[in-house]
Amino acid sequence: SDISFEVNKGELFGLIGPDGAGKTSIFRILTTLLLPNSGTATVNGFDIVKDYKQIRKCVGYMPGRFSLYQDLTVEENLNFFATVFNTTIEQNYNLIKDIYVQIEPFKTRRAGQLSGGMKQKLALCCALIHKPVVLFLDEPTTGVDAVSRKEFWEMLKRLKEQGITILV
């Protein structure tokens, strides 16, 4: 019920706790997808209730269950998320390039036909497509093989080096 923490810019911060402790709820509150029952919180200096529109523009969120459109192709998913944030793949390609080159050979494949590791990479690209300053990753390596898990943490390290604040 009482929780308080501060994450510095460019930090990789892990929120750890048992199942049912409220980690996902905290992420949903901080990404303005869920209203808190009480208390206050800010993300990137913005109040989560009053400034929710500004927060949505500056955060990326990758839920525990990938929020991909299974019937859309890799490229269609990326274009959809880019359009939602009024941007394009090309505008922010430098941010997703390291990840995108790994899924590009599958760009015409439907998301539902991708392996767990490829879905994870696509979901991360979609969360990054609008160049967020804060990235929320809810259990990002669940159900992913050891090699993909290691690659994923390497990608996060590179994102951190680019100044993105990451909460896992």
Feature map (PLM): residue ranges:
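ABC transporter nucleotide-binding domains
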Residues: 3-168
